[in-house]
Amino acid sequence: NKVNIIDFDYCKREIRAYDISNFMIKVLKRCNWNLEYAKEIINAYNSVSPLRDDEYKVLYAYLQFPQRYWRLANRYYYNEVNWGQNTFSNKIESIINEQEKFTKFLDDFKKEYSL
């Protein structure tokens, strides 16, 4: 029973809502922004360490931030990856194409947690 730590250079001190939102986004973008998956993640987290009401508001704010657009634009601008123009175009189109599902998810999340 050993634990191996990877990417320790990304380690930082941050509020809980930040970590939860990052994990949720990674999962939900692969699950068509299904609210049920988000609820399962939050319920599992709450079973160990319940979120406070104010943390739900911060979590919602983090979920609204266009992180994926920003990260993609940042990588493109600073030439952080060796992708051709078509790769960037395809990635941005993919994010745009899921915008309707993402917006519906945000609305449903807001209603579910009375935000």
Which residue stretches match the model-derived regions?
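Active-site acidic catalytic loop and adjacent metal/ATP-binding pocket
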Residues: 1-18
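All-alpha amphipathic helical-bundle segments outside canonical DNA-binding/catalytic cores
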Residues: 53-62
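Alpha-helical structural elements
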Residues: 3-5, 40, 65, 78, ...
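ATP/Mg2+ or Mg2+-diphosphate-binding catalytic cores
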Residues: 70-115
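Short amphipathic alpha-helical surface patches that serve as generic macromolecular interface elements
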Residues: 38-42, 56, 89
